């Protein structure tokens, strides 16, 4: 029989219910988490046995949104969900990051977490719900796990922190921050901010961590009531004798290798040491396992690097703890792009371009929470050659999507509003070299490329990655970390912002015990590094170019009467299609009558504006126009008088005398002067040739509103 167990609690302004025992009973554990009608079903399956030869922890997190959750049918050809979208990939990473460091060292059993959004309230984002569910299933499962974790979203509205703001509240928030951690420590932060101070950001992290304790308490209570028995798992004991033999052969040599400042040379030397030591030990004793030797060598590498840092010795590349690597900043490096920059920091390099497009180039994103349009795109590419490797090239992987989103968060706060700069902007960061913090190099490069393209960003922005090495109460915060320092350290702390404050903060912590003091030191040290980088960037370009590239489309804006929109578009879009083909421009019309004409050639834009003005011009009764005969019928002739308007000259209005046959007086294509007699309620125009007397000013085209570029 089904025996559901439910735990309900208040979480800020929302009510959360966690239910288990009802569904997916063959999974290791399963829960349904409901937060004010946003429901996510989360399962975990852990394999009891380790695959032979497994040398890493195979944790997989799948997050999937079902359109039925929002009462919709998928819009794809097959009418079913396909591969995960970018948003789903980002949420999967959000779930993964705080969970992964809580599995014990040496645990290599395969674990898969699947979170499925099955109901959605547009005001409650399912990401926090999914994170709570993932924490709950692991706590219930009995799988070795040092959790549970909580998760909270923090907004900053009217100078107040807001817990789990609704979608509407977030629109007025200067901050969108997600924080996750255990009862005693923050483990993960992901945020986007509207240039907040270090103190405001740190306060948000602390606030979110304090508020999520209620989640942790309730998950613990549910696990006590319904949790499965803990797995009888113990880590493999360390082979101290083998460890000592490996250390004797390799530790000093690895120490020397880690004094080589050039990355590829250092890696080659480290690999050679590992191969020689492994071969020597296997020659002495064939019963030894190569994987175990490699694991010990890895721990020795970590010990060498970390102990030096903690003793205050120079880092791998000879820098002090708060030094930034050498910078090289160049703009305008590509001749035909709209904006470009090459940003180099040590052995990390990004070639970044900015491209300006029209509104129709904006990305329409159909999400479960609703459809939205994105006018600012930032794409990050990490080819294998950037780290001296070969590999598959293809669609972006999870890491590239995540790094691109972080870089975008860093730049978004300074982007101009649509009414200030009516362009769609796409930034692409090509990582050409990588040795630490390529996402932050992308922020710097994006800022430079945007200014080179003439995009009026509010301020230059830069990013920096901070690291941490901590043993007991001894700790050192490192500025501008290398790839090795990221891998061998305890924290990856990325901060982007302007001279005034922070625009993005991402933090991933591998250990517990990170205090507010450590985070404060890291933020302050990051500020100094950020200001240094900005000062170097300013020497290359200190403000946006005064004009956009000659190769970029120029957008000219005019206003027409909204009632005339249908005339410009035409039946089935016939008129606007003909206009774009005739003028070689791109034309977009908004509901309020705003017309945007984009063209790389000024003359083409003027031609398009002129034609639109003709079409939308108002015809005045009693005014005389010059028109062309378009059709002849028995009862008169139709005359086009500009602006796509056509009127009828009745046979009685052609001449002062009786007209028997219209064709005796008029021919198709003939230019004639006509006077507007009347415009009836249906918009039909009555014209007269005989009343178009000499001496009255003739209008070739109707009067139309002036354009504004």
Swiss-Prot record:
The keyword Zinc does not apply. Pfam families: KH_1, PNPase, RNase_PH, RNase_PH_C, S1. InterPro entries: ExoRNase_PH_dom1 (IPR001247), ExoRNase_PH_dom2 (IPR015847), ExoRNase_PH_dom2_sf (IPR036345), KH_dom (IPR004087), KH_dom_type_1 (IPR004088), KH_dom_type_1_sf (IPR036612), NA-bd_OB-fold (IPR012340), PNPase (IPR012162). GO terms for molecular function: 3'-5'-RNA exonuclease activity; magnesium ion binding; polyribonucleotide nucleotidyltransferase activity; RNA binding. It is an enzyme of class 2 (transferase). GO terms for cellular component: cytosol. It is found in: Cytoplasm. Its EC number is 2.7.7.8. Residues 622-690 form the S1 motif domain. Its cofactor is Mg(2+). It catalyses: RNA(n+1) + phosphate = RNA(n) + a ribonucleoside 5'-diphosphate. One of its GO terms (biological process) is RNA processing. Keywords: Cytoplasm, Magnesium, Metal-binding, Nucleotidyltransferase, RNA-binding, Transferase. Involved in mRNA degradation. Catalyzes the phosphorolysis of single-stranded polyribonucleotides processively in the 3'- to 5'-direction. PANTHER family: POLYRIBONUCLEOTIDE NUCLEOTIDYLTRANSFERASE, POLYRIBONUCLEOTIDE NUCLEOTIDYLTRANSFERASE 1, MITOCHONDRIAL. This is Polyribonucleotide nucleotidyltransferase. It comes from Photorhabdus laumondii subsp. laumondii (strain DSM 15139 / CIP 105565 / TT01). The lineage of its organism: Bacteria, Pseudomonadati, Pseudomonadota, Gammaproteobacteria, Enterobacterales.
């Amino acid at each position: 029989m089904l025996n559901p167990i439910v735990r309900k609690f208040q979480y800020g302004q929302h009510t959360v219910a966690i239910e288990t025992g009802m569904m997916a009973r063959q999974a290791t554990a399963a829960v349904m988490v409901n937060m004010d009608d946003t429901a996510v079903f989360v399962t975990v399956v852990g394999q009891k046995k380790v695959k032979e030869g497994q040398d890493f922890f195979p944790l997989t997190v799948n997050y999937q949104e079902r359109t039925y959750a929002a009462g919709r049918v998928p819009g794809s050809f097959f009418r079913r969900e396909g591969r995960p979208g970018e948003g789903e990939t980002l949420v999967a990473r959000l779930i993964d990051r705080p969970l992964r460091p809580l599995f014990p060292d040496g645990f290599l059993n395969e674990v898969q977490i699947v979170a499925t959004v099955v109901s959605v309230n547009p005001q409650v984002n399912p990401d926090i719900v999914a994170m709570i569910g993932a924490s709950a299933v692991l706590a219930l499962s009995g799988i070795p796990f040092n959790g549970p974790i909580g998760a909270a979203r923090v907004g900053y509205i009217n100078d107040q922190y807001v817990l789990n703001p609704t979608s509407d509240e977030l629109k007025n928030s200067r901050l969108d921050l997600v924080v996750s951690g255990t009862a005693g420590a923050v483990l993960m932060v992901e945020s986007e901010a509207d240039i907040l101070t270090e103190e405001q950001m740190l306060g948000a992290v602390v606030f979110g961590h304090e508020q999520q304790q209620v989640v942790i308490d309730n998950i613990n209570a549910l696990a006590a009531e319904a949790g499965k028995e803990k797995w009888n798992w113990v880590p493999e004991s360390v082979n101290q004798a083998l460890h000592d033999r490996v250390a004797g052969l390799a530790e000093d040599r690895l120490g020397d290798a880690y004094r080589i400042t050039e990355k590829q040379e250092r890696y080659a030397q480290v690999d050679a040491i590992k191969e020689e030591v492994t071969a020597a030990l296997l020659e002495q004793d064939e019963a030894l396992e190569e994987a175990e030797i490699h694991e010990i060598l890895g721990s020795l590498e970590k010990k060498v690097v970390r102990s030096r840092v903690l003793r205050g010795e120079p880092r791998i590349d000879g820098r002090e703890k708060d030094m930034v690597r050498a910078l090289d900043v160049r703009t305008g490096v590509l001749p035909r792009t709209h904006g470009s920059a090459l940003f180099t920091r040590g052995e990390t390099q990004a070639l970044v371009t900015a491209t300006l497009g029209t509104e129709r180039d904006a990305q329409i994103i159909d999400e479960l929470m609703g459809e939205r349009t994105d006018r600012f795109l930032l794409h990050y590419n990490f080819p294998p050659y950037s780290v001296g490797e070969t590999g598959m090239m293809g669609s972006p992987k999870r890491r590239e999507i995540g790094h691109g989103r972080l870089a975008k968060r860093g730049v978004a706060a300074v982007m101009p509003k649509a009414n200030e700069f009516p362009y769609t902007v796409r930034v692409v960061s090509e990582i050409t070299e990588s040795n630490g913090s390529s996402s932050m190099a992308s922020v710097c490069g994006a800022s430079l490329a945007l200014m080179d393209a003439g995009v009026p960003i509010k301020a230059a922005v830069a990013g920096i990655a901070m690291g941490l090495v901590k043993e007991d109460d001894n700790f050192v915060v490192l500025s501008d970390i290398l790839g090795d320092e990221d891998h061998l350290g305890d924290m990856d702390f990325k901060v982007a912002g302007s001279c005034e404050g922070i625009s993005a903060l991402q933090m991933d912590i591998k250990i517990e015990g990170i205090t507010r003091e450590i985070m404060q030191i890291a933020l302050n040290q990051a500020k100094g590094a950020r200001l240094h980088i900005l000062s170097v960037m300013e020497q290359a370009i200190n403000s946006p170019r005064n004009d956009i590239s000659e190769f970029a489309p120029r957008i000219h804006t005019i206003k027409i009467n909204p009632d005339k929109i249908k005339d410009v578009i035409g039946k089935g879009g016939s008129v606007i299609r003909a206009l774009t083909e005739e003028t070689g421009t791109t034309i977009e019309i908004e509901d309020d009558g705003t017309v945007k004409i984009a063209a790389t050639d000024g003359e083409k834009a003027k031609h398009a504006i002129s034609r639109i003005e003709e079409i939308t011009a108002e015809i005045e009764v009693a005014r005389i126009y010059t028109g062309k005969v378009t059709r002849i019928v028995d009862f008169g002739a139709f005359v086009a008088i500009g602006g796509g308007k056509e009127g009828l000259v009745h046979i009685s209005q052609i001449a002062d005398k009786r007209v028997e046959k219209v064709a005796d007086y008029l021919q198709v294509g003939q230019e004639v002067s006509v006077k507007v007699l009347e415009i009836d309620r249906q918009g039909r125009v009555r014209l007269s040739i005989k009343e178009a007397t000499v001496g009255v000013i003739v209008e070739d085209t109707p009067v139309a509103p002036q354009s504004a570029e």
